[in-house]
């Protein structure tokens, strides 16, 4: 399995309908400045997922292969269930200050991503693959695939995306990854 491609697919699917994608829509609708929003999302994701991947690499080295296999398998199954539940984002959760759109986006995204399923997936992927750069780049590309169209197309696109169907596909992917980890160790 290619760590980069698995990371792209897992995070892109998990991000559909996620609170950070909803945050992208809110920021785009409120500020109507796609470039600083997109750059803020990129840099925030890189930092957040790099830190998450470092934690994952450390966990991967600190625990034995059997503990990693069981932890990853059970965690991916839990993420599959978590993915089925639609996220909600209250407009009050989005930054309301009049500061720089880039800084607002960077901080809001970094904080919204803390403990989010895509951050948890990044930790797990890094623990599994021991490929820090491939996982960070893959998860960042996955976030871009899901969030850039949300910023550029705004609410009109969100109304047309079949979120329930995408959530089912994403949940299925995480369930398959979890089952594969438990059954085959990989």
Located regions from the model:
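Selected transmembrane alpha-helices and immediately adjacent juxtamembrane segments
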Residues: 90, 94-119, 125, 129
């Amino acid at each position: 399995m290619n760590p980069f491609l698995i990371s792209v697919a897992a995070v892109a699917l998990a991000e559909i309908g996620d609170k950070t994608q909803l945050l992208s829509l809110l920021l785009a609708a409120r500020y109507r400045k796609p470039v600083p929003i997109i750059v803020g999302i990129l840099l925030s994701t890189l930092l957040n997922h790099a830190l998450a991947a470092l934690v994952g690499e450390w966990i991967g080295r600190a625990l034995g292969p059997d503990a990693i296999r069981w932890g990853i398998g059970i965690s991916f199954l839990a993420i599959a269930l978590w993915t089925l539940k639609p996220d909600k984002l209250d407009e009050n959760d989005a930054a309301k200050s009049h500061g720089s759109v880039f800084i607002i986006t960077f901080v809001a995204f970094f904080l919204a991503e803390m403990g989010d399923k895509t951050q948890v997936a990044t930790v797990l992927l890094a623990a599994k693959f021991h490929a820090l750069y491939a996982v960070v780049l893959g998860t960042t590309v996955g976030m871009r695939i899901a969030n850039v169209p949300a910023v550029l197309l705004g609410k009109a696109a969100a109304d047309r995306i079949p979120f329930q169907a995408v959530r089912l596909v994403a949940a299925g992917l995480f369930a398959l990854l979890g089952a594969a980890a438990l059954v085959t160790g990989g």
